[in-house]
Amino acid sequence: MFLPQEIIRKKRNGEALSTQEIQFFVQGITNNTIGEGQIAALAMAVYFKDMTMDERVALTCAMRDSGMVLNWEHLNLGGPIVDKHSTGGVGDVVSLMLGPMVAACGGFVPMISGRGLGHTGGTLDKLDAIPGYQTSVDNDRFLKVVKEAGVAIIGQTGDLAPADKRIYAVRDITATVESIAMITGSILSKKLASGLEALVMDVKVGSGAFMPTFEASEELAKSIVAVANGAGCRTSALLTDMNQVLASSAGNGVEVREAVRYLTGEYRNPRIHEVTMSLCAEMLISAHLASDDADARRKLQAVLDNGKAAEIFGRMVTGLGGPSDFMERYDSYLPKAAIVRPVYAANAGFVTAMDTRELGLAVVAMGGGRRAAGDKLDYAVGLTDFIRLGQSVDADKPLALIHAQTEDQFAQAASMVQAAVKIGDTQPQALPEVYRRIGLADL
């Protein structure tokens, strides 16, 4: 018999908790026998005293098992269950291309995604820009679309990792979000409840990243790789750059438009192409669908070239309630802003740095992201045709196109973009898209 307050005291004093103690506490969170005050106290104790890797594995597994864990065996899919998770950024529309590309190569991708958080865009908010697309469906519909299309991107259902929902809500209002142990548990409990065989983590680094420093990003990546493998899921991580907007656009509808153009071959921004290919290749290798990076990239390029990946995206959209001719007529289905105008730099020169976080907040300021949980979003607003680091700007070459609904919105976004993009006389060195890979051997 355990007492919640004794478990809290033990962690407060810096001792390691047993698997049984962690399971007891998480069960209490799930069945409401442990209150918000006790969750907050344990979260603060963990924030200050941390958790060993064994404790993190126990926490993740207990949170995963707090609800339903999807089982794919009865569907006889004939391919591996594999997924990707990103710590989020600005213009990070990778999931919309990656899911269909991996599915086209023989993987099955049951992707549980989130909404926008702070300055970062949410995959579900982007998909909400597609008329009729349902991000909230029951498990039967989810399984059916994954089986038929090979990929489905939906939101967390109430019966997947319910303990995480309660813990996260408390962490959010008690200044305990930044605990790497608890971030690890929160991310992985939801992902592992999807019944994955392999997972690839995309951990962002730079001015638009969730983690403030390269070292913190690396620490989170190592924690996730260690804990996920400890919980029985083959997992690796890539540290990728978020010192500039990743795609050419940032917003909801504008990013969906870019994803469709990428899949159909109409336009592929080279930076997001490299990040997408790197993550997809890592997934194919992890899922034993490719022998090495070169083999994986060959297969991925083939499904882009032959239209199979684009066709699968269309199938997923239709399966989740969207238009059956979305890929053919995407431009008429996606919302458009009243004002689309360029914003220019105050002086000519090279783009030397970007405050990517501030650029994300410019989209939020126009109504493309939330200030409060219940806010309704404007899916048409955003930024497109974004300048890249190292490129030159002048009176003819704008920083970006702003998609706004009013003149006031345009003016506010324009001044935020101008302040966030630094212009100098010397061209900076190019930054890599992918900094490093972290696998089990790197721990």
Curated annotation (Swiss-Prot):
Record's keyword terms, sorted: Glycosyltransferase, Transferase
The protein, known as: Thymidine phosphorylase
Record text on subunit structure and interactions: Homodimer.
PANTHER family the record matches: THYMIDINE PHOSPHORYLASE
SUPFAM superfamilies for the chain: Nucleoside phosphorylase/phosphoribosyltransferase catalytic domain (SSF52418), Nucleoside phosphorylase/phosphoribosyltransferase N-terminal domain (SSF47648), Pyrimidine nucleoside phosphorylase C-terminal domain (SSF54680)
SMART domains according to UniProt: PYNP_C (SM00941)
Organism: Aeromonas salmonicida (strain A449)
GO cellular component, one term: cytosol
Alphabetized NCBIfam families for the sequence: PRK05820.1 (NF004490), T_phosphoryl (TIGR02643), Y_phosphoryl (TIGR02644)
Reported function: The enzymes which catalyze the reversible phosphorolysis of pyrimidine nucleosides are involved in the degradation of these compounds and in their utilization as carbon and energy sources, or in the rescue of pyrimidine bases for nucleotide synthesis.
Gene designation: deoA
UniProt similarity note: Belongs to the thymidine/pyrimidine-nucleoside phosphorylase family.
Gene Ontology molecular functions: 1,4-alpha-oligoglucan phosphorylase activity; thymidine phosphorylase activity
A GO BP annotation: pyrimidine nucleobase metabolic process
Catalytic reaction equation(s): thymidine + phosphate = 2-deoxy-alpha-D-ribose 1-phosphate + thymine
Record pathway: Pyrimidine metabolism; dTMP biosynthesis via salvage pathway; dTMP from thymine: step 1/2
Matching Gene3D superfamilies: Nucleoside phosphorylase/phosphoribosyltransferase catalytic domain, Pyrimidine nucleoside phosphorylase-like, C-terminal domain, Transferase, Pyrimidine Nucleoside Phosphorylase, Chain C
